[in-house]
Amino acid sequence: MSRYTGPSWKRSRRLGISLSGTGKELARRSYIPGQHGPNHRGRLSEYGMQLQEKQKLRWMFGLNERQFRTLFARAGKIREGQHGTNFMILLERRLDNVVYRLGLATTREQARQLVNHGHITVDGKRVDIPSYEVKVGQTISLKEKSKNLQQVKDALEAVASRPSFVSFDEDKMEGQLVRFPERDEMEPEIDEALVVEYYNKLL
């Protein structure tokens, strides 16, 4: 399945959350496209709620359905912890997401572009695979010439805070995943139990 390439604001308004994390998509209108006001949203069925939550999480991290389902299945094979929480942790460990969490990009989409274009290194070696799974203690940085990118400078200036499961050295412009995140440190807008229920009916 191909990745959606349409306007992200339409998806954000449809789901009622900011998928980019910036909040700009909902600044003017928080109701879905096609509605003429905020009070015309229909009530979803149980399946509709599960599907919507799955789409919300998938679009938030920018994965296509095949990638998303594969990662979900992997999470189910982890013996310790809950399936949904383990799935969220695997999503957080993606290289593009860690780049975003470190503040080197303002959105996950921008972080994915940095990785795709070869600007990111892991332990000193260039990695251009957004789905690369970051291990605790690995050092994430920019290629030396990439440290002067204006979009990176702008992103770093915009950082208000970083989650405690990552560390960042401002002088070296490099950071690490210091531990796996706890559930309350990950996306609060997501009810991953609904995602688990959705796939349990299919798989």
Curated annotation (Swiss-Prot):
Keywords: Ribonucleoprotein, Ribosomal protein, RNA-binding, rRNA-binding
CDD domains xref list: S4 (cd00165)
Gene Ontology biological-process annotations: ribosomal small subunit biogenesis; translation
Pfam families hit by this protein: Ribosomal_S4, S4
Residue ranges annotated for the S4 RNA-binding domain, each copy included: 93-153
An example Gene Ontology CC term for this record: small ribosomal subunit
GO molecular function: rRNA binding; structural constituent of ribosome
Signal peptide, first to last residue: none
Annotated family: Belongs to the universal ribosomal protein uS4 family.
Role: One of the primary rRNA binding proteins, it binds directly to 16S rRNA where it nucleates assembly of the body of the 30S subunit. With S5 and S12 plays an important role in translational accuracy.
Entry protein name: Small ribosomal subunit protein uS4
Source organism (scientific name): Lactobacillus delbrueckii subsp. bulgaricus (strain ATCC 11842 / DSM 20081 / BCRC 10696 / JCM 1002 / NBRC 13953 / NCIMB 11778 / NCTC 12712 / WDCM 00102 / Lb 14)
